[in-house]
């Protein structure tokens, strides 16, 4: 594909749209992926046919390709043109390396356009705002939060890079607008510049891609990497890829950096590693995160880091809706009533705002989750806006003027996960739930609302509003997640490690392909924006280490 400024900017805009795919019970795998064992569709296909899928290690399956039709030689090959890959590629180009970036899609950006801001400590934005954060103190809190799964030295390496990376991004043409807290976090979340309604991450990526085009960075679109090449010693010496014409290209290289975005869309890997029912989960962002990089690294001898199944869960999303849209925010994430398959509450319903990974983890512990509200809440949200803000997508005080029309469209389209009734008992019966149990739960909840105190889960008093007048609405919701954060075990230099914990020479990983950065949950309540920040910073850290290894 010819690379022009127009293509780059169109690519970023298209990526923003792609990041808005709605979730359904069946659309949980990358439909564009080949129907083979490495595609991530096996589990869903087998389940649809009432069969058990073959039990194999999906982290170590790669596609075989034939002999190369073309051979090229470069200093560095970067796999993936998302946040991590572009950061590594741009940095490498500026450092004088002969670098090529391989991207399996026809556009750059990956799922990064779905982000809104990134974590940093010690930035000039924080200094100008009078924000002081002790690096060692926050590392201690994170290590405790993650049960000492991560490597504290990896944290130090990352944290000490974040402020300089903010400066670097601004020099590259990427802007920021402010640094704020997210829920209970410290003010570490650096929001990207731009109009919030147009997607801050998309605007970040438009600028970043434009910089890559300005430099003349060599990005090969529609050229997916298939396998790593290793020598007799186990060192990685290149990549086998296939271009859009089906030609096998051997990219010989002195080092390879992998940044393919994790495995959020690979339902085989989600089932194996996260131990979830793929029909009850929903990945936010664009498709294509099929675990390519992890699988290639595993095939080359790398091991998975502890907590390989960790994902950035955030909690409820109504089937058939898109994260951050008015109908999703109003029906799924507001502090109304959340119950499980037994019609029991299981968490304070304002947890999404307080610490959204905890909302997602609580959801993950249930078999099925429903949110419930009444007409007065829909009227309130449409007239006055939501009770809880969701990132920069739906802000408090801004009326959701199309909410009821959007919801009615879903009902008219036959969404089977929405029920409406004039009584709580009838609502339960329509949904196939125990009517007596749901009535008892609602009555107990309304009594707490009347007393102004949630004595069960300590939800904030201001959100204790009774659900006592019909029509009543019940929504079956999936558990949403932004990305997976479990991956390959790496050193503090982002080097891949083998089963002996020795470095695999020439192989580096960043972003969501690199593991060992999280425990069993995302840490937005402490380090808001750490995923996006890790994507960019690890790309640069991997490039630095690879450049040192190459000797340039």
Region roles according to the model:
Residues 11-13, 34-58, 63-65, 98, ...:
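Conserved N-terminal/central alpha/beta ligand/cofactor-binding core
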Residues 72-74, 246-255:
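Core beta-strand elements of the Rossmann-like FAD/NAD(P) dinucleotide-binding domain
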Residues 251, 255-318, 528, 532-541:
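Glycine-rich loop(s) and the adjacent beta-strand/alpha-helix scaffold that form part
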């Amino acid at each position: 594909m010819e690379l022009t400024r127009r293509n780059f900017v169109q690519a970023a805009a298209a990526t923003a749209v792609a990041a808005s795919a709605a979730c359904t019970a069946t659309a949980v795998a990358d439909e564009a992926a080949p129907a083979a064992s490495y595609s991530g569709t096996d589990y869903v296909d087998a389940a649809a046919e009432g069969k058990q899928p073959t039990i194999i290690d999906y982290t170590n399956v790669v596609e075989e390709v034939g002999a190369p039709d073309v051979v090229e030689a470069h200093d560095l090959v970067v796999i993936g043109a998302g946040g991590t890959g572009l950061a590594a590629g741009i940095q490498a180009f500026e450092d004088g390396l002969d670098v090529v970036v391989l991207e399996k899609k026809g556009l750059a950006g990956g799922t990064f356009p779905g982000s809104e801001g990134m974590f940093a400590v010690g930035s000039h934005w924080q200094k100008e705002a009078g924000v002081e954060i002790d690096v060692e103190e926050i590392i201690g809190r994170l290590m405790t939060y993650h049960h000492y799964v991560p490597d504290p030295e990896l944290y130090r390496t990352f944290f000490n890079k974040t402020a300089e990376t903010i400066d670097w991004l601004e020099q590259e043409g990427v802007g920021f607008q402010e640094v704020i807290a997210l829920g209970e976090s410290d003010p570490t979340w650096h929001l990207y510049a731009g109009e919030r309604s147009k997607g801050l991450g998309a605007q970040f990526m438009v600028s970043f891609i434009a910089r890559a085009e300005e430099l003349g960075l060599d990005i090969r679109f529609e050229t997916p990497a298939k396998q790593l090449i290793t020598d007799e010693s186990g060192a990685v010496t290149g990549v086998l890829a296939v271009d859009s014409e089906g030609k096998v290209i051997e990219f010989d290289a002195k080092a390879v950096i992998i940044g393919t975005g994790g495995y959020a869309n690979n339902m085989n890997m989600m089932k194996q590693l996260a131990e979830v029912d793929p029909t009850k989960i929903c990945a936010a962002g664009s498709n294509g995160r099929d675990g390519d990089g992890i699988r290639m690294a595993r095939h080359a001898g790398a091991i998975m880091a502890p907590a390989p199944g960790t994902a950035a869960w955030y909690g409820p999303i109504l089937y058939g809706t898109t994260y951050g849209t008015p109908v999703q925010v109003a029906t799924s994430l507001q502090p109304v009533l959340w119950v499980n398959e037994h019609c029991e509450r299981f968490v304070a319903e304002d947890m999404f705002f307080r610490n959204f990974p905890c909302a997602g983890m609580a959801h993950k512990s249930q078999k099925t989750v429903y949110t419930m509200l009444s007409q007065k809440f829909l009227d309130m949200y449409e007239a006055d806006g939501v009770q809880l803000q969701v990132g920069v997508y739906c802000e408090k005080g801004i009326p959701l003027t199309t909410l009821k029309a959007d919801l009615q469209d879903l009902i008219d389209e036959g969404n089977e996960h929405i029920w409406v009734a004039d009584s709580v008992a009838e609502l339960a019966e329509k949904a196939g739930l125990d009517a007596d149990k749901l009535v008892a739960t609602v009555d107990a909840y309304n009594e707490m609302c009347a007393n102004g105190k949630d004595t069960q889960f300590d939800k904030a008093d201001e959100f204790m509003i009774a659900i006592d007048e019909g029509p009543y609405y019940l929504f079956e919701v999936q558990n949403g997640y932004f990305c997976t954060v479990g991956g390959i075990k790496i050193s503090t230099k982002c080097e891949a490690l083998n089963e002996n914990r020795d470095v695999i020479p020439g192989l580096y990983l960043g972003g969501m392909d690199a593991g060992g950065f999280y425990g069993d949950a995302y840490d937005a309540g402490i380090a808001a924006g750490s995923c996006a920040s890790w994507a960019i910073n690890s790309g640069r850290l991997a490039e630095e280490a690879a450049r040192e290894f190459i000797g340039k």
